[in-house]
Amino acid sequence: MGNNKGHCYTWNESIAKRGPNEISSCLLDFIKKQLKNGVKKIIFYSDNCGGQNRNRFVFSMFAYASKTFGIQILHRFLERGHTQNEGDSMHAVIESAKKRQSSIFTPDQWIMLIKMAKVTGQPYDVKEMSQKDFYNFNDITLTKNWATDASGKKFMISKVKQIEFLSSQPSNRN
């Protein structure tokens, strides 16, 4: 069950890029945090940004995490143009807080702004990523068959609306 707590991951561009390995690394960190709370099923909702959310790097990391930690992971993609997710709301709150600041000069100031952006409720949980927090998921991505799905049909990653990984069958794709 969710706790309505927003989680933010930050790093500057001298530390890492903003590609699928970086996003997968943040998601893996989030999954590990949830395991400490006894969570066995995690459901992610995200937009259709293929470069960050809907790609074989993220999916390979989910398969790895599902098998390694014995958990179920479900990732649902929102319909383009029909929904607004919690991430959009969080970004709006952070942007609003930024407008109230005269200037921001350092990454530390950004982190403090993000932590304090939410006026009511729990503040956002902010993790400042370091180089050691990022992984390269290329090797595990290469071990998967991305050409066909479990039933042998052509796998169109851009058409995926939902994908589920079970610890007993980490390669299942819906």
Q: What are these language model-derived features?
A:
Residues 1-174:
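Extended mixed-charge, aromatic/glycine-enriched low-complexity segments
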